[in-house]
Amino acid sequence: MSCTIEKILTDAKTLLERLREHDAAAESLVDQSAALHRRVAAMREAGAVLPEQYQEDASDVKDMSKYKPHILLSQENTQIRDLQQENRELWVSLEEHQDALELIMSKYRKQMLQLMVAKQAVDAEPVLKAHQSHSAEIESQIDRICEMGAVMRRAVQVDDNQFCKIQEKLAQLELENKELRELLSISSESLQVGKESSVAPEAQTIR
């Protein structure tokens, strides 16, 4: 798909370059044709003014005859015909350029349509793939979070159980310590009473 898009873009770029070239050539032909029209109009005006000058001044006709006006007019007519032929050729060339432009534009529109369709297809596919990838990634993250939550719950339960056991052990140790202290206190009192009891008979004997 990417190769097709690259080819379409390359073809479209080529068509645009050709379009610019033909457009420039067509503008040049139009300018040349307009210049020829002006030259033909100027020559026709000159040809129309020349006989009027002959009629206005008859004496000048004799003087002008030495310049062979008929030959001059014939030459001008030949030039006009040549210019008209050149103008026709230019217009034919211009029409060919216009046909080429229409063909290029038709191909360009077709290429752009294919490009738009291809881009829509390509744009949809990555979005779908990205959506699927993101969905899979999110599902994986959810699974990992659930696993971590289960581990944390087990750890909390273990900590709670361990804390309870420690608390029970501490309570037991405190109780045992208290009992030992009580026993120690009882033993100490018993010893003290025993000593006092033994000391009393000895004192009576000495007396």
UniProtKB/Swiss-Prot annotation:
Coiled coil: 70-102, 162-192
Pfam families: SIKE
Domain of life: Eukaryota
Cellular component annotations (GO), alphabetically ordered: cytoplasm; FAR/SIN/STRIPAK complex
Transmembrane segments: none
UniProt KW keywords: Coiled coil, Cytoplasm
Keyword Coiled coil among record annotations: yes
Cell compartment(s), UniProt: Cytoplasm
Chief place where the protein resides: cytoplasm
Keyword Amino-acid biosynthesis found: no
GO MF term set: protein kinase binding; protein-macromolecule adaptor activity; small GTPase binding
Gene Ontology biological process terms, A to Z: negative regulation of hippo signaling
Disulfide bonds: none
Purpose: Physiological suppressor of IKK-epsilon and TBK1 that plays an inhibitory role in virus- and TLR3-triggered IRF3. Inhibits TLR3-mediated activation of interferon-stimulated response elements (ISRE) and the IFN-beta promoter. May act by disrupting the interactions of IKBKE or TBK1 with TICAM1/TRIF, IRF3 and RIGI. Does not inhibit NF-kappa-B activation pathways. Associates with the striatin-interacting phosphatase and kinase (STRIPAK) core complex, forming the extended (SIKE1:SLMAP)STRIPAK complex.
Subunit-structure text: Interacts with IKBKE and TBK1 via its coiled coil region. Interaction with TBK1 is disrupted upon viral infection or TLR3 stimulation. Interacts with CDC42BPB. Interacts with SIKE1 which mediates association with the STRIPAK core complex composed of PP2A catalytic and scaffolding subunits, the striatins (PP2A regulatory subunits), the striatin-associated proteins MOB4, STRIP1 and STRIP2, PDCD10 and members of the STE20 kinases, such as STK24 and STK26.
Family, similarity comment: Belongs to the SIKE family.
Entry-linked PANTHER family: SIKE FAMILY MEMBER, SUPPRESSOR OF IKBKE 1
Protein name per its UniProtKB record: Suppressor of IKBKE 1
Species of origin: Rattus norvegicus (Rat)
Taxonomic lineage: Eukaryota, Metazoa, Chordata, Craniata, Vertebrata
